[in-house]
Amino acid sequence: MISHREFRPAVVVIGGSGGIGRAIASVAARERGAVVLVARSPEGLAAAAAEVREGGGEAFTLELDLVAGDAPTRLEDFLSARGLVCDVLVNSAGYGLRGAATALPIDGQLGIIDLNIHSLTELTLHFLPGMVARRRGGVLNLSSVAGFVPGPYMALYFASKGFVRFFSEALHQELRRTGVTVTCLAPGPVSTEFLARSGAYQTVLFNILPKVDPEYVAERAWRGFKSGRRLVVPGISAKLAALAAALLPSAAMLPLVGRLQRGGNDPCPCGSGMKFKKCCGTRQIQLRRGLRGIIP
């Protein structure tokens, strides 16, 4: 039996098989400690583990259905059996769907709540008390600039990211002077498979905002977390988007975001009967071209 004092601290990356989570795992590996990658994809986990080892870290992988009711317990048992304790929890798993809420499958939309909200909350609340008792460690939660505004045509995704932001910022305040940090990461569009899977790549909004690499986001996320930051918004364009969302009233933002969330092949909301990209979307495309070279 391993005594509590003999447990080694580990960075646990939920959704570590790809995207931002995988990039954060690679950055964390530089500290040459244990990195535990948790996801459903065995191929992605194997590739991410190889990157962690190349970076100097010790990699462990766990295939886990994150929305299963016993996921936190199974993860803790996995750690305990290897003499590890969750010192840093990175919640980067999530997904979204694009389309009118009334047209998308109900099960798919409820799945967004299950993964983006319920699973993240359950894992966070499961591991935080141990961190507080040890007076060290913390949680890095992945939100998005989408969490600053309501998002017509990706209503549940935007709402879920708003939950993550408010939940994380509240915990950050609650845990001051405990030695534990909770940081919210809110990037703009990132060049990962998420854009294709969710359909977000089709929208004018995600095409106007410049995309950044997950490695860029990971570097700034880890640096911000290590320095105890409450909120990290990587990149000037993402910061400008977050600022605009904070300053403009919802009455102005909602119609704007709704139009920008349209895909090029969607019917134009003006009622012309034309495709959006051939009608009102043309003006947004011209705006995007005009912004190139101005917004990095």
What is the role of each PLM region?
Residues 92-97:
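Conserved NAD(P)H cofactor-binding loop of Rossmann-fold oxidoreductase domains
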Residues 144:
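Residue(s) in the substrate-gating loop at a strand-loop-helix junction
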Residues 174-238:
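SDR active-site lid
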Residues 124, 160:
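Active-site helix of classical SDR
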Residues 100-113:
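Substrate-binding pocket helix/loop in short-chain dehydrogenase/reductase
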Residues 31-48:
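Conserved glycine-rich Rossmann-like NAD(P)H-binding loop of the short-chain dehydrogenase/reductase
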